[in-house]
Amino acid sequence: PMEQVAEYCRDYEAKIAQCGGIDIQLLGIGRTGHIGFNEPGSDHTTHTRMITLDTVTRIDAASDFFGAENVPRRAITMGVGTILEARKIIILAFGENKSVIIARTVEGDVTPAIPATYLQKHPNTDVLLDAAAAAALTRTRLPWLVSNVQWEPSIIRRAIIWLSEKMSK
């Protein structure tokens, strides 16, 4: 029942504490940058609570619910603060449709607009990606800007094109 949700959320947090905290937090990431169901605007201090799902999140979940009209409008989620208390965090992302949000999460500023960016502040986070999800990262697109590269013909060609465009040549 709705009137018991707040109590349930408090009890859930208490059980986590009683068990000594979370050792490993395994997360996916939504197109909006949500982790769990911590939608854009979520604060880094939040704990388990009921939230209203973002329209994009509901659309993305539609196939799991046999249509968008069947996707719940609200969900209970572990808060960002609770997630950040885990000793180890692993975030997984696969597919080209995750590449832009992964780049913003890993390389962008920490912001409540993209809750996954809070993971930058965690001392023990791994981001595991396939090549498609990593495609928009600087280290994939322009590796010569961030590390030493083995200058093979394809990379030389990409670097020359990039530099020519940058110099308007």
Question: Where do the PLM segments sit?
Answer:
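Conserved phosphate- and dinucleotide-binding cores of soluble alpha/beta proteins
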Residues: P1-S168
